[in-house]
Amino acid sequence: MIKREFLPESAELKIKLTADSKKWAEFYQKAEQKQAAKVSLRGFRKGKVPLEKARAYLNPQAVFELALRMFLPELEKQAATNIIDSDNVIESPIFNIVNMDKNNLEIEFLYPVYPEIKLPDYKNLKTKFAIKKITKEDIELQKQKLLEAKGRFIEVNRPVKIGDVINFNFKGFIDDEPFDGGEGENFDLRIGSNSFIAGFEEQLVGLEIKKEADIYVTFPENYQVHTYANKKARFRVKINKIKENQPAKLTNEFVASLKIQNVETISQLEVYLENLTERENIERAKIDFQKNALTEIGEQVEVPLAKKLINLEIERLNEVFHSTLKQQEIPLKEYLKITKFTEKDIYDQFEVEAKKLLKNSFIFAEIAKLEGLVPTQQEYESHVEKLAKFTGKSVQEISETVSYNEIQINITNQKVIDKLIEFNHETKDEEIVNKNQNDNEIEQDKEQKDNNEEKIKQENNLENK
């Protein structure tokens, strides 16, 4: 007997079946015989103990599990014949045992299906796509970053200022007790980089070399070591050295030394930096919009998630986590010691993140379905070429290592974001498109332009290292 039932609250199709009792009995007997072959009794050669005598030494649970393992592929195949296209099954099932004894087996298969989703009015979100307008101050800041990146650091004997790189010692206390990871010597820090928790670097400003001082901070609520979250701490600090940045001088010769195509004078550099800043602002606006738009939509919609999908996503996150630890050569035990986490804490975090990622993926998929957003072959090939260029691999290598579906999903998601921007923006459509174009782009090909911009970004990032 087979019974189908759709479970909308968990986005699953349940197919319950009663196995043929004769077949189940046969598999149970085979399992008994396999387990009996492992029994050793005095007077019998190994594997030759009669089943009647071996039964007394068998683990009934092990026999049932083996019998089920052998029978399961056939049962799953039988259940699958009762699936129709309109069920929208998207993954293989998990199963539950309803009833099982030596003579009878009832089992149910739970297939993840595409969930029922009722989206809010995503065409009129409160979240709007807005590009920050460029000011003269923005261009001056870009120039200053570039000059500082090309400058040099010299030791000075004066109080600490914003922008200095200091070498210092520190020791942290919580409730007047030292804590793990709260101590360091000869540590280099650029003041203003926000590398430490809020308030720490600001209190270093004004301190002098060789003098000790106390700094008081509060660990943030989301601090990675959760046992320190929201805790007040005192740091005893001592400045060893102070280095001041002496920026390079902005001249036409300096600009020429950057070797940026079609940029040889100060005025050309300013135009170039303006174009670069525009593109950065667009990218930043897209990132902010995507985050806030998904949050707004997500708060207004419930997306039922099948347990199998959640488990698979947790497994993926766990694999990424352990791979990262391995790359950084950090044993799991050491990580747990440093962060004060338990393995259950980590699993719980993965579960929350898995549900969030799955929910967002279905929101993307539903909007794509409603708007008819389907990647073209040209978009696929262009995406593969970009991945190849970014990773330094060939197009063929990318095609072989990154699945077709994964690339299609990435393209579709970007099309969804573009469509949401089209619906929810504070800038005219043509302005959004034209922001990506400028005089320099017309004069130089796309590849060279990207290389130039990456060069500028790298120069600007040097100062933060």
UniProtKB/Swiss-Prot annotation:
GO terms for cellular component: cytoplasm. It catalyses: [protein]-peptidylproline (omega=180) = [protein]-peptidylproline (omega=0). Residues 443-465 have a biased composition (Basic and acidic residues). Pfam families: FKBP_C (PF00254), Trigger_C (PF05698), Trigger_N (PF05697). SUPFAM superfamilies: FKBP-like, Triger factor/SurA peptide-binding domain-like, Trigger factor ribosome-binding domain. Its main location: cytoplasm. It comes from the Bacteria. The keyword DNA damage does not apply. It is found in: Cytoplasm. InterPro entries: PPIase_dom_sf, PPIase_FKBP_dom, Trig_fac, Trigger_fac_C, Trigger_fac_C_sf, Trigger_fac_ribosome-bd_bac, Trigger_fac_ribosome-bd_sf, Trigger_fact/SurA_dom_sf. Keywords: Cell cycle, Cell division, Chaperone, Cytoplasm, Isomerase, Rotamase. One of its GO terms (biological process) is protein folding. Signal peptide: none annotated. Consists of 3 domains; the N-terminus binds the ribosome, the middle domain has PPIase activity, while the C-terminus has intrinsic chaperone activity on its own. Belongs to the FKBP-type PPIase family. Tig subfamily. Involved in protein export. Acts as a chaperone by maintaining the newly synthesized protein in an open conformation. Functions as a peptidyl-prolyl cis-trans isomerase. HAMAP family: Trigger_factor_Tig. This is Trigger factor. It comes from Mesomycoplasma hyopneumoniae (strain 232).
